[in-house]
């Protein structure tokens, strides 16, 4: 059983149904103007039903950050050495928390740059409506830990759209929404990064699942207006 929301693109939903999944699409916004609270409430209802499904709960499960602490970060260091800057998007915050914990444990001087979408509440910002699935949350993930010395940055979704479409047309590479957000953050900060720095950017998704959204002219015009095409 998959519980998703109106921000999910139709291709992903069709893909899941083709694989035999039962997909529920919630349509009510939560108190913060997103869908996560509504989705979580529905999942809890399903889990509590007699014979209900098992829920691994990526928002609270400590195995989520643990695997990134033990494997993702180790793979980065083994291949590239200790980065000076490491850009990570904040969704469930599993990748972000796992890497931050590993950096602290290693005693590395790596600056972890945590990237979120404007309108997300994870870093304590004001909630607002968001349209691109991936990064951001309308409910603060329980696994997010304030103790880590993160450099936190917000990216407006219109800049995510511009970045994704620019890269697709200039570089011939189709980034997903989360990847575009993190790349937009790097673009905004690149002039502040000392020359010769070793920078690692975690790109978690590709753009095929965003063809009906970020890469669809009608969708972009409806949600962001004509200025989104200025890239």
Residue ranges and their predicted role:
Residues 1, 8-13, 90-100, 178-186:
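Short glycine/serine/threonine-rich phosphate/pyrophosphate-binding segments
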Residues 1-3, 105-113, 189-198:
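Phosphate-handling active-site elements
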Residues 88, 154, 176, 201:
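Redox-cofactor binding/interface segments in oxidoreductases and associated redox assembly factors
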Residues 78, 101, 105, 184-191:
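Short, well-ordered alpha-helices that flank and scaffold nucleotide-derived cofactor binding pockets
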Residues 56, 173-179:
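Short glycine/threonine-rich catalytic loop with a Thr-x-Gly-x-Asp
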Residues 3-85, 117-168:
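Small/polar-residue-rich loop-to-helix segments that shape phosphate-bearing ligand pockets
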Residues 138, 187-231:
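Phosphate-binding loop/pocket of nucleotide- and phosphate-handling active sites
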Residues 160-162, 167, 183-192:
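A short, acidic, amphipathic alpha-helical segment used as a generic capping/interface helix at domain edges
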């Amino acid at each position: 059983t998959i519980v998703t929301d109106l921000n999910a693109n139709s291709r992903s939903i069709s893909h899941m149904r083709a694989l035999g999944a039962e997909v529920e699409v919630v349509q009510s916004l939560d108190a913060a103007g997103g869908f996560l609270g509504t989705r979580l409430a529905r999942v809890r209802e399903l889990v509590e039903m007699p014979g209900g499904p098992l829920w691994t709960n990526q928002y609270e499960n400590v195995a989520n950050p643990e695997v990134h602490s033990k494997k993702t970060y180790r793979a980065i260091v083994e291949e590239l050495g200790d980065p000076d800057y490491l850009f990570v998007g904040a969704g469930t915050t599993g990748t972000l928390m796992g890497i931050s914990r590993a950096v602290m444990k290693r005693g590395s001087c790596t600056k972890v740059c945590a990237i979120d979408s404007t309108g997300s509440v994870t870093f304590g910002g004001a909630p607002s409506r968001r349209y691109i699935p991936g990064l951001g949350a309308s409910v603060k993930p329980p696994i997010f830990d304030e103790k880590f010395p993160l450099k936190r940055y917000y990216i407006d979704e219109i800049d995510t759209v511009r970045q994704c479409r620019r890269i697709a047309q200039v570089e011939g590479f189709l980034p997903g929404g989360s990847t575009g957000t993190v790349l937009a953050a790097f673009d905004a900060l690149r002039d502040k990064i000392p020359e010769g720095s070793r920078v690692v950017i975690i790109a978690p998704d590709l753009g095929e699942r965003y063809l009906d959204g970020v890469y669809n002219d009608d969708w972009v015009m409806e949600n962001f207006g004509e200025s989104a095409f200025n890239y």
